[in-house]
Design a protein with these regions (language model features):
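A structural motif
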Residues: 28, 107, 112, 210, ...
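Hydrophobic faces of well-ordered beta-strands that scaffold small-molecule active sites
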Residues: 3-7, 31-33, 62-67, 115-117, ...
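Alpha-helix-loop-beta-strand connector modules within alpha/beta enzyme cores
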Residues: 49-67, 135-147, 173-174, 235-240
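N-terminal pre-domain/capping segments
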Residues: 1-102, 108, 180, 208, ...
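Histidine-acidic metal/acid-base catalytic patches
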Residues: 1-3, 13-24, 164-288
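Flexible, glycine- and charge-enriched loops at secondary-structure boundaries
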Residues: 41-44, 48, 86-93, 124-131, ...
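Active-site acidic/histidine proton-transfer and metal-coordination neighborhood
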Residues: 17, 74-181
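Active-site-proximal loop/turn and secondary-structure-junction residues that shape catalytic pockets
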Residues: 9-11, 35-37, 68-71, 121-123, ...
Length: 288
């Protein structure tokens, strides 16, 4: 099993070679870069090529990119204007599509295979106009991504338009060939199903089209992005759910949120906690 980490852990700061050194030193072999311009300036070729060199120097593979979720420079600004493929207003939708094209075009100088994308914001309500907007945007993006060797993977979230059943119905009805899913276990654990059924019932509609996974834990109330086993997810059950996917060797990306504050552990300690959690996860996986 390849050890993979999302750079979301460092999203509040610029991603540097020193961070990559820490990631590699903690035993990870690949990364998913979370795209905010203050973290990684993906629209400047010089920055992209420098990142390619830094990843190669630390023997890290770029397995995926996470699309920006906000027009603001920092993902940590909660007041930021959402960058959404569901924009009903055409001008704003085209702006979002152009920004996502820039992320896809990173593959020209820094190859990667999957772009992880949210279906709108965290509170996106289901609306036929938004659905049509998403279809129009994705139709163009899938074609553009295909030429770059990138698969678009829409992630399940806690919004109505990010609900797994909604996402599967969207794909079945629009027949968007090539669209895939990123299954986020932490988000699934926040669904409205009874706790013991949340993961299976969230995974079931997406199962045949899941191409990647985000691993993180929470206590079933908010999106905490904790290391596995630090929340209330039943990980042996979660592993059985993941192993039911038709695609073998799914990329499993650990997506942690940085703990901050005077008494917070250092980033190095948080990386160590992630590594320890993955040791336990892999041991359980092999026994299941």
């Amino acid at each position: 099993m390849q050890r993979l980490l999302s750079t979301y852990l460092f999203v509040s700061r610029k991603l540097t070679p020193e961070h990559l050194e820490q990631i590699a030193g903690a035993g990870f072999q690949g990364v998913e870069i979370f795209c905010t311009r203050s973290h990684f300036e993906y629209s400047i070729k010089q920055e992209v090529r420098a990142m390619a060199d830094a990843l190669e120097a630390h023997h890290l593979q770029l397995v995926s990119m996470h699309a920006p979720t906000s027009r603001d420079l920092s993902a940590m600004r909660e007041s930021g204007t959402p960058l959404s493929i569901c924009e009903v207003e055409r001008v704003r939708r085209v702006e979002a599509m152009d920004e996502l094209r820039r992320v896809i075009d990173v593959a020209d100088d820094l190859p990667y295979s999957r772009l992880i994308l949210h279906m709108g914001g965290t509170r996106e309500t289901a609306d036929p106009r938004k659905r049509d907007a998403a279809f129009s945007t994705l139709e163009h993006l899938i074609l553009h991504a295909h030429h770059a060797g990138v698969a678009i993977c829409v992630e399940n979230t806690t919004s109505e338009m990010g609900d797994p059943a909604y996402l599967r119905a969207f794909v079945d009805e629009t027949r968007l060939t090539g669209l895939r899913f990123n299954f986020d276990i932490g988000h699934a654990h926040l669904s409205d199903f009874p706790e013991e059924e949340r993961l299976e019932k969230s995974f079931s509609p997406l199962r045949e089209l899941v191409s990647s996974v985000h691993l993180h834990d929470n206590h079933g109330e908010k999106d905490e992005h904790l290391p596995p086993y630090d929340g209330t997810i039943d990980w042996p059950s979660a592993i059985r759910v993941l192993q039911s996917a038709p695609q073998t060797s799914l990329p499993l990306v650990l997506e942690l949120k940085e703990k901050t504050g005077a008494e917070a552990p250092t980033v190095a300690e948080q990386l160590t906690a992630g590594r320890t959690a993955m040791d336990r996860f892999e041991e359980t996986w092999e026994k299941t």
